[in-house]
């Protein structure tokens, strides 16, 4: 213990000494009027250079005499007397610089370059060549310090201390971790590919309110804020659904939105209070059309973003080139709890007994539909590894979905699961204004009974339905969970740049 404390004290002292030395260098730069120049322009990015010139031999590069200008962060440096090698990192990756005293202006190498630190941001100009080991490099004829880093790179002092630091100081994680940078590149590519797919399928992108007087569109506890000028409480949206369907009433027959939702709930490997969803609504369609659209979306995204319809996640492999599996909720329960008699799931007393045997705490306000849903979540959800649609959700837990024509106790709704996680939710929309008003009233009763996730009564939305919502289907997909899948990430914090964190004391 004493030795460990001593090492920690030594490391802290080393860091303090380095911080002091770097600030002293900045003082000198300020005195010379070259602390933070802003007149350097680059014309090349590392990955573009590698893609175009890695295959060329050094003789060909010398003959071409290609001069490039680059800029980035100095990650490594090997000083060998009058010459040095530097690894420069930019948005595209890394490229090596060859720096020779005799090729730079007088005094640059010894008086400036050798005093710079790892983490400093440099600008360099020179000709491309290959080293004896065949590495594409830039033979520098100009080298400038563009930004002085006052703190060392994280790996110099034993890397990032823990996972929490990666999330709190994401900038350090992105500097030091190639995998993290790649994860967020993939995320950006996923968002762009979704938009292309939606536009190609005739959808219009729209934006709806993030602050709402009445939160709706999902069963969740909202965040509350206050609008000073209007002197009213408002809610950060939990879903855009009701506004998007108002647009369908207004005549926009295919709409979608990609944006953040906010739910005042706990943090877990699958949950962040602020998260990104894509919701779409299309008129003259039902939930079966959504199933086809969802399969096409995932097939297109994986091919466009990853170059293959096959995705490896942990020790599982998913093939999005083929149709998803399909089970009803009751079929899934019986499959993963074989001792279940399906008829018992239609009997309140027997379903209650099953739930209690599974350790489910039943609330007084729950009916049969909610109990069966809880049984499903407890027995089957985590076992749905391969892409699977679960259908026939009870009306009790689906206040916005259309009732099934053959059985009014269930709805024309599905959720789909991949890797044991819910990824999306879709259904034929309820467009019967009177039925919707009745279900809102039931939600109000549930809220009065203590269910703080029950929905509010939205009178204006009922009025919109009274003007006529065409037969419509709607789908919501969690973008964060989708990106987790595509990047083989096992916690949602790894795919959100700045996840929610408890403030440091």
Swiss-Prot record:
HAMAP family: Lys_tRNA_synth_class2
Name of this protein: Lysine--tRNA ligase
Catalyzed reaction equations: tRNA(Lys) + L-lysine + ATP = L-lysyl-tRNA(Lys) + AMP + diphosphate
UniProt-listed CDD domains: LysRS_core, LysRS_N
InterPro entries, A to Z: Aa-tRNA-synt_II, aa-tRNA-synth_II, aa-tRNA-synth_II/BPL/LPL, Lys-tRNA-ligase_II, Lys-tRNA-ligase_II_bac/euk, Lys-tRNA-ligase_II_N, Lys-tRNA-synth_II_C, NA-bd_OB-fold
Entry's EC annotation: 6.1.1.6
Keyword Protein biosynthesis: yes
Keywords assigned by UniProt, alphabetized: Aminoacyl-tRNA synthetase, ATP-binding, Cytoplasm, Ligase, Magnesium, Metal-binding, Nucleotide-binding, Protein biosynthesis
Cofactor (UniProt): Mg(2+)
GO biological process, one term: lysyl-tRNA aminoacylation
Residue sites binding Mg(2+) 2 per the record: 422
Cell location: Cytoplasm
GO cellular component term of the entry, any: cytosol
Chain positions recorded as Mg(2+) 1 binding sites: 415, 422
Cofactor: binding details: Binds 3 Mg(2+) ions per subunit.
Record text on subunit structure and interactions: Homodimer.
Family statement drawn from the similarity comment of this UniProt entry: Belongs to the class-II aminoacyl-tRNA synthetase family.
Domain of life of the source: Bacteria
NCBIfam families from the UniProt entry: lysS_bact, PRK00484.1, PRK12445.1
Keyword check for Cytoplasm: yes
One function term, GO molecular function aspect: magnesium ion binding
């Amino acid at each position: 213990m004493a030795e460990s404390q001593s090492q920690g004290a030594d490391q802290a002292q080393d860091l303090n000494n380095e911080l002091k030395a770097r600030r002293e260098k900045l003082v000198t730069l300020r005195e010379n009027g070259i602390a933070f120049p802003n007149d350097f322009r680059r014309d090349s990015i590392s990955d573009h250079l590698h893609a175009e010139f890695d295959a060329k031999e050094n003789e060909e590069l010398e003959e071409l005499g290609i001069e490039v200008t680059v800029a980035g962060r100095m990650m490594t440096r090997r000083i060998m007397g009058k010459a040095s090698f530097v690894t420069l990192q930019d948005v595209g990756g890394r490229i090596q610089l060859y720096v020779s005293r005799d090729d730079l202006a007088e005094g640059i190498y010894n008086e400036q370059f050798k005093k710079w630190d790892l983490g400093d941001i440099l600008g360099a100009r020179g000709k491309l060549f290959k080293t004896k080991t065949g590495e594409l490099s830039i033979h520098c004829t100009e080298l400038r310090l563009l930004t002085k880093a006052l703190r060392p790179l994280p790996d110099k002092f034993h890397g990032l201390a823990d996972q929490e630091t990666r999330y709190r100081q994401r900038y350090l994680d992105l500097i030091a971790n190639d995998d993290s940078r790649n994860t967020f590149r993939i995320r950006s590519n996923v968002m762009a590919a979704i938009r292309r797919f939606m536009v190609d399928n005739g959808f219009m992108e729209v934006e709806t309110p993030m602050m709402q007087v009445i939160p709706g569109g999902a069963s969740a506890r909202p965040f509350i804020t206050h609008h000073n000028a209007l002197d009213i409480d408002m809610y950060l949206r939990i879903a855009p659904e009701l506004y998007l369907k108002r647009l369908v009433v207004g005549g926009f027959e295919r709409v979608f939105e990609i944006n953040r939702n906010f739910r005042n709930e706990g943090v877990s490997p699958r949950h962040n209070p602020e998260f990104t969803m894509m919701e779409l609504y299309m008129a003259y369609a039902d939930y079966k059309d959504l199933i086809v659209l969802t399969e096409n979306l995932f097939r297109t995204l994986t091919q466009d973003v990853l170059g293959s319809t096959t995705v490896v996640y942990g020790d599982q492999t998913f093939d999005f080139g083929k149709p998803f599996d399909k089970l009803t909720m009751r079929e899934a329960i019986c499959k993963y709890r074989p001792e279940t008699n399906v008829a018992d799931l239609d009997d309140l007393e027997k379903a209650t007994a099953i739930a209690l045997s599974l350790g489910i705490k039943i609330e007084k306000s729950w009916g049969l539909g909610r109990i069966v849903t809880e049984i499903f979540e407890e027995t089957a959800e985590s076992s749905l590894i391969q892409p699977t649609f679960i259908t026939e959700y009870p009306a009790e837990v689906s206040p916005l979905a259309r009732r099934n024509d053959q059985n009014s106790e269930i709805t024309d709704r599905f959720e789909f699961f991949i890797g044991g996680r819910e990824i999306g939710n879709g259904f034929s929309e309820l467009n019967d204004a009177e039925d919707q008003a009745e279900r809102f009233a039931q939600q109000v009763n549930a809220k009065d009974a203590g269910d703080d996730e029950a929905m509010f009564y939205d009178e204006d939305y009922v009025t919109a339905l009274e003007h006529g919502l065409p037969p419509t289907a709607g789908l919501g997909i969690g973008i964060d969970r989708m990106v987790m899948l595509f990047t083989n990430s096992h916690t949602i914090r790894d795919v959100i740049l700045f996840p929610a964190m408890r403030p440091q004391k």
